Structures are given as C-alpha cells and as structure tokens.
From Swiss-Prot:
Keywords: ATP synthesis, CF(0), Chloroplast, Hydrogen ion transport, Ion transport, Membrane, Plastid, Thylakoid, Transmembrane, Transmembrane helix, Transport. One of its GO terms (cellular component) is chloroplast thylakoid membrane. It is a single-pass membrane protein. It is found in: Plastid, Chloroplast thylakoid membrane. F-type ATPases have 2 components, F(1) - the catalytic core - and F(0) - the membrane proton channel. F(1) has five subunits: alpha(3), beta(3), gamma(1), delta(1), epsilon(1). F(0) has four main subunits: a(1), b(1), b'(1) and c(10-14). The alpha and beta chains form an alternating ring which encloses part of the gamma chain. F(1) is attached to F(0) by a central stalk formed by the gamma and epsilon chains, while a peripheral stalk is formed by the delta, b and b' chains. This is ATP synthase subunit b, chloroplastic. CDD domains: ATP-synt_Fo_b (cd06503). The chain crosses the membrane at residues 27-49. F(1)F(0) ATP synthase produces ATP from ADP in the presence of a proton or sodium gradient. F-type ATPases consist of two structural domains, F(1) containing the extramembraneous catalytic core and F(0) containing the membrane proton channel, linked together by a central stalk and a peripheral stalk. During catalysis, ATP synthesis in the catalytic domain of F(1) is coupled via a rotary mechanism of the central stalk subunits to proton translocation. One of its GO terms (molecular function) is proton-transporting ATP synthase activity, rotational mechanism. HAMAP family: ATP_synth_b_bprime. Belongs to the ATPase B chain family. It comes from Buxus microphylla. InterPro entries: ATP_synth_b/b'su_bac/chlpt. The gene is atpF.
Length: 184
C-alpha cells in the first residue's frame, strides 16, 4: 500500500513538461502503466471484442439453424424413404402372392391340358383298336366267305353236270318269261 501512495506522491513531484525521463523503479511504474493500458484496452477493445463475440454468436446460431434445417430435411427424406420401402414391400408381397396364384393357375392349366391330351390319346387308341378289330373281322369274314364260296363252287362243280346245268338254265329262262308275261 505504501508503494501505491508513493507512486501517487511521485506523480505530484514530476518535473514540468519540458523534461522526459524513464522511471526505473519497476514497482512504482508498473501498476500505473498496467492500469492505463488496461483502461485503454477496455475502452477501445470493448467494441471490437463485442463485435467479435456478436459475429461468433451469429455464426454459431446460423450453423445451428442450418443444422436444424438439415436435420428436418433428413427426417423428411427418411420418412419418404420409409414410405417408399413400405410401398415396395407391399408390392413385393402382392407380386409374391400373385406369383404363387399364377403358378398354381399355370399348374392347373398344365394338368388340365395334360389330362385332355391323355384323354384324346386314349380315344385315339380306342378308335385305332376298334378300327383294327373291324379290319381284322372284315378280313376274317372275307376269308371265310371266300373259302365258303370256293367250297360251294367246288361242291356245285362236282355235283353239276351238263344235263343238270341245261335244265337249271331252262327253268330260269322259263321263270323270267313268266314274269315278263305277268308284267305286260
């Protein structure tokens, strides 16, 4: 405290304006110089420091606002993406169900088509068998008829002689003549 009062006393004892000198007493001059420098810094630096702090505050607030806007935009995009995902999942489920039903429908169509083809082949087989049976029966009939005819001709040829042959022809001619007279 004594040093502080000494420094104020020394201010009173300073020489007049014509002289300039350095006070080498550090303890006496330092608090005064520091108080003057701090006073000047506070007086002039207050506005600069206030401006710097205001600018910094505005940048931080602007960054926070931008971040908030980006966050809101990201949330909106996320919701849109989730909605699209739900829609795509529903469509995929629908395609899956439709695909299964389409597969079942195609399977039934194929089974029905195969059944119809088998039925048609069975009918064709039956018709072919029936046709072959009829042909075989006709061939057997023809063969039996030919053999019977040959046997009858053989019997007739062995039994017929010229005289019997002439009598048969005459009798037939007589019958035709009688029929002709009846119709005229």
């Amino acid at each position: 405290m004594k040093n502080v009062t000494d420094s104020f006393v020394s201010l009173v004892n300073w020489p007049s304006a014509g002289s300039f000198g350095f006070n080498t007493d550090i303890l006496a001059t330092n608090p005064i110089n520091l108080s003057v420098v701090l006073g000047v810094l506070i007086f002039f630096g207050k506005g600069v420091l206030s401006d710097l702090l205001d600018n910094r505050k505005q940048r931080i607030l602007s960054t926070i606002r931008n971040s908030e806007e980006l966050r809101v935009g990201a949330i909106e995009q996320l919701e849109k993406a989730r909605a699209r995902l739900r829609k795509v999942e529903m469509e995929a489920d629908e395609f899956r169900v439709n695909g299964y039903s389409e597969i079942e429908r195609e399977k039934l169509n194929l089974i029905n088509s195969t059944y119809k083809n088998l039925e048609r082949l069975e009918n064709y087989k039956n018709e072919t068998i029936h046709f072959e049976q009829q042909r075989a029966i006709n061939q057997v009939r023809q063969r039996v008829f030919q053999q019977a005819l040959q046997g009858a001709l053989g019997t007739l040829n062995s039994c017929l002689n010229n005289e019997l042959h002439l009598r048969t022809i005459s009798a037939n001619i007589g019958m035709f003549g009688a029929m002709k007279e009846i119709t005229d």
